[in-house]
Swiss-Prot record:
Belongs to the universal ribosomal protein uL3 family. Part of the 50S ribosomal subunit. Forms a cluster with proteins L14 and L24e. One of the primary rRNA binding proteins, it binds directly near the 3'-end of the 23S rRNA, where it nucleates assembly of the 50S subunit. One of its GO terms (cellular component) is cytosolic large ribosomal subunit. Residues 1-10, 17-26 have a biased composition (Basic residues). Pfam families: Ribosomal_L3. Transmembrane segments: none annotated. One of its GO terms (molecular function) is rRNA binding. This is Large ribosomal subunit protein uL3. NCBIfam families: L3_arch (TIGR03626), PRK04231.1 (NF003261). InterPro entries: L3_arc_euk, Ribosomal_L3_dom_3_arc_sf, Ribosomal_uL3, Ribosomal_uL3_arc, Ribosomal_uL3_CS, Transl_B-barrel_sf. The keyword Hydrolase does not apply. GO terms for biological process: translation.
Amino acid sequence: MGMKRNRPRRGSLAFSPRKRAKRPVPKIRSWPERETVKLLAFPVYKAGTTHALYKENNPKSPNADQDVFTPVTVMEAPDITIAGIRAYGKDTKGLKALTEVWADSFDKELGRKINLPKEPKANTEKLDEVADKIVEVRAIVHTNPKDTNLPKKKPEIIEIKIGGKNISDIIAYAKDIIGKKLSINDVFTGGEFIDTVAITKGKGFQGPVKRWGIKIQFGKHQNKGVGRHTGSIGPWTPKRIMWTVPMAGQVGFHQRTEYNKRILKIGENGSEIVPKGGFLNYGVVKNNYVLVKGSVQGPAKRMVVLREAIRNPEDKFGLPELTYVSTESKQGN
């Protein structure tokens, strides 16, 4: 980076305020445009990391047709349940919910999260009544953590946009999937580029050196035991502290999006990917799983939403050939 004359901080102000997320489930605020009628995202649970070798199928790479080492993240992908459909219109203030339809029946675990109707009825005709006003249709889905090794039964509920150009086709697809279970193979394929949206690991209350990367002061400051503080918090005038001054505070547990992660494999037999002794702080994988190249934000057990790539790269290379996936113990023995 080189030497800078003034370096008040290393961190970016673009991420301010650096406060805790409201809940450990991410909220997706923007969606890509797709012509295919299908869900544009899928929630999974992060299990852990390992490493793998794959044959590079990018012809532009200097390692083309060679075995390449890479760290990979393993995420368990149990089937999701389509609990309802919500239709949105548009006014001068933006999107506005027009109507919603709930399924005929629900999993009993969903009652741990919301109040279920006593006599559910999927009245899908409500979608046809406002079809001329609909600009976007989203599926109300919930996860099924009871099918995994997680010590929880309460599901997470999120909205996922249904892609497509023709509203009538989107409504027909929504009517078809309501009340059903979908697998990750209904949404993604191997070799595809995706975005990962999740809440990062929480670090708690930290000082300005760790939080903003300010310089540690030596000499008389360190002798007085104040070497890790902000040297100046502002001028005499204006007589207030600017919000840009690097201060101690919350680190981690923020919602972050990482773009263009590559799916190396989507598997059905989780036992083939579990290392000896299981994944640390997670255990074994019992359902479908996704192998993503590189790291993914968040600790083990946290829900990660895989979204269709919103900055979709022009070059697509298809599914690479995996030659080796490590299943050695991650417990250090």
